[in-house]
A protein has these predicted regions:
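An N-terminal assembly and electron-transfer interface module characteristic of large anaerobic redox
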Residues: 1-417
Length: 417
């Protein structure tokens, strides 16, 4: 399928759209979905001093990710690089009953306090939250975003599963960058965005990564679960991927497509209207692509959790499917999936005070390991005032504990040590 070519000139668009950094492995591709006559996207990449800036304008009781997002956006506006009169801020919102539901209002208040009350805040959601402030989107945007998500998923899995074993340092990163450039060219030109080409590219990507020369050793694998921002953004998880690899282990982060399918399953398809019918069709398409991606990974002996519906079924009786706020039952289900499929060490990270993660995650982990009879789940919080030393020590405890001791949460593991 061919869609309209992207114009990358900032002056072509009516507005400059600040997009919060949330998905390290996906935004290099998904960002192309935002280009249009209306918007020129700028994905926030500033890191220096963002926590301090964010806490000037956001109450410490709010989620840690919000302080990072606000800090990045205020610093970008203060930098003088952008025409403030053309800037708009994007804040994706799930619209659930958690602190994240207040992100849009909190961001507006922060901008007002920072002297940028004139800068509009747009929301991107499917729940009808603040319809007057909804970002405009069309079919080419959705189509590009879908391709960016699935290509980002498979490249993330391949990179994380290859880099710890590469004989020539940097080989996996170079190959990842090569494929990002290839897909980026197609995204910009609006060509090769068909399911047939995606099917072929999945296998070419797996083949290329499988050809990288590897060390013979087999490393232990740590599964990462938790809140969306903390799981997929290095700012949110304090560079946990880099830390785990430096400790001689391999990390596995479950693809974003599981969250997309979970969200459609729990929030969109249960209504009886035209939007729900469209969501069901889109969900069928996502399921088909996800199965194809997993087949490609398995063909080249790369680990993956089962396709969404099988993955959900395997967690039956262990998680409560009625917990649908935020990441909801998906958090516990990912931990179950990892342990059932041989990844018996799971690291759970979440913002401090995240009630969804405490109810559907931390409060559930001890019962999961008892019922499964194996595995260990270590849970820790990220926060502006939290200790990174404590965070990394918990992770080290998980990495270094003997596999024969595995069956319980971190408190039970400490007792055995």
């Amino acid at each position: 399928m061919r869609v309209k070519r992207i114009n990358e000139d900032m002056n072509y668009a009516d507005s400059i759209l600040f997009v919060p950094a949330m998905l390290d492995m996906h935004f290099p591709l998904i960002r192309y979905a935002f280009y249009s006559k209306d918007y020129y996207p700028v994905v926030m990449d500033e890191e220096d001093g963002i926590t301090e800036t964010g806490l000037k304008y956001i109450n410490h009781d709010m989620c840690y990710p919000l302080s990072q997002i606000v800090g990045q956006m205020v610093n970008a506006l203060n930098s003088g690089k952008y025409d403030v009169n053309r800037v708009k801020l994007l804040m994706p919102a799930a619209g659930d009953a958690c602190r994240g539901a207040n992100y849009v209002g909190a961001l507006r208040r922060a901008m007002q306090d920072a002297g940028y009350g004139c800068v509009p805040v747009l929301t991107l959601n499917v729940r009808g939250v603040e319809p007057e402030s909804m970002m405009k989107f069309d079919f080419p945007m959705v189509w590009r975003a879908m391709f960016g998500m699935f290509y980002g998923d498979i490249l993330m899995v391949l990179l994380h599963a290859t880099r710890p074993y590469e004989k020539k340092k940097g080989a996996a990163d170079r190959l990842w960058n090569k494929w990002i450039k290839i897909i980026s060219r197609d995204m910009i030109a609006g060509k090769n965005l068909s399911l047939l080409v995606m099917h072929r590219n999945f296998r070419l990507m797996c083949r290329d990564f499988a050809r990288i020369r590897r060390k013979g050793e087999r490393k232990q694998v740590i599964g990462l679960v938790g809140e969306l921002y903390v799981k997929y953004c290095h700012l949110g998880n304090w560079d946990v991927v880099d830390f785990i690899e430096k400790q001689g282990a391999e990390i596995h982060v479950n693809p974003l497509s599981y969250y997309a399918l979970y969200y459609m399953d729990t929030h969109m398809i249960r209504k009886h209207n035209l939007e729900a019918k469209g969501a069901r069709l889109l969900m069928k398409l996502f399921e088909m692509i996800q199965k194809d991606m997993i087949k490609a990974l398995e063909k080249y002996d790369y680990f993956s959790l089962p396709p969404y519906w099988q993955f959900k079924k395997e967690a039956h009786g262990l998680v409560n499917y009625n917990v649908r706020n935020g990441d909801g039952w998906l958090i516990g289900a990912e931990a179950v999936g990892y342990i059932k499929h041989g990844v018996e060490k799971v690291f759970a990270a979440q913002p401090f005070g995240c009630m969804v993660n405490h109810c559907a995650g931390r409060g559930l982990y001890p019962s999961l390991t008892r019922k499964l009879g194996k595995g260990s789940i270590v849970s820790t919080d990220v926060d502006a005032s939290a200790s990174k030393l404590n965070y990394y020590n918990r992770l080290l405890m998980l990495i270094q504990v003997d596999s024969s001791m595995l069956c319980g949460n971190e408190d039970e593991v400490k007792e055995r040590e």
